[in-house]
C-alpha cells in the first residue's frame, strides 16, 4: 500500500480552526494530516501538534504570546517531515511559517487572504516570495493576486457551508430564503411581529462601547410588537454587566446559538462590522453596521487603512466589484440611538427601501452560493501536493 503524503494545516483562531476542519474532512482519505488547531480539526482527523489560543484580557494576552512561541517551535520542527503546508488566515504567524517552509522546499497553500486590500498592502511582496498558491474567499481578491502574477483562485467562503449545514436543522430544507424566518422563530418560541438581532461584537472592549447603544435601542421600540435577540456563541464574551442589564427586558432573548441562526430569523440586524455582515447578507437580512473604536485606535486606523470607502464586507465587495447598488448604512464612531432607530424603522416599514437592500444582499450572496469552498481547496491540494 502506497504511503500517504503528510500535510500540516495551521490555524490560529477559532474561525480558521473551523475552516481547517472542513477541508480536513476531504483531505483525510488522501493525506496524513497534522496541524495546529482545536477540537473541530481533531474530530476531522487531524493529529494536533499545537492548539489555537483564545485570549481577550491583558493577562490572557501574555499567555497567548507564550503559546504562539510554543506553536511556532512545534510547527518549525514538523516542517521537516511534511510534503506541504496549508496556512489559514492568521497572517503574522503564518507568513513567517511560510517563509521557513519555502526555505525547506515545501509547497505552501495559503487559505483566507490577509486583508491586503485594506492595510499593510506591501505584504503581497512577501506572499509572492513564500506562497505557492492563494485560495481566497472574497471575489475581488482574485484579481489583486492575478495582477501580481501569484497563482490564485476564488474558492467561495466556508461560512456559507457552515450556515447551509446548520440552518438545515431549523428549516424544512436547506434553502436560505426569507420565507423560512417564521419557521425558525417557532423553534425558539418567538412569536412577536418584528424581530431584531443586536450584535455588539465578540470582544469585551467592543461590547463595553456598545452597551449604552444596545440598551437605548431596546427602549425605542414597542415591546408588545418587537422582540430583540442577542446571540451568545461560545466565542463571544458578553460581560456580566451587560447580561444583567439586558436580560431584565421582557422582550429580549439571549440566544445560545451561532449568530447566523439569530440573523436568519430576524427582520433587521444591528451588527458590529466583521464576518457577521457577510452572514447577514447570505440570509438576506437587512442590516445596519455600527462601529466604534477608542479615539486613539480610530485615529491610527484612519492613518493606516487606505483604499476602502466602507467597513462592512458586503459594501467592500460591492465597491471592488463595481456593483451599481444601494449600500448598507454604516455608523462609525458616532453611535446615536435615535438616528439608528430611525434607520431600523426605515428598513422595516419603507417597502421600496427594504426591497432595495434585500436585492443588494442577494447580489452579494450570489458570489458565494455557486462554490463550496472546502471542496475547491481540496481540488487545489490534490494538484499542488500530489
How would you name each of these model-derived features?
Residues 1-386:
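Nucleotide-activated sugar donor-binding and catalytic core shared by glycosyltransferases
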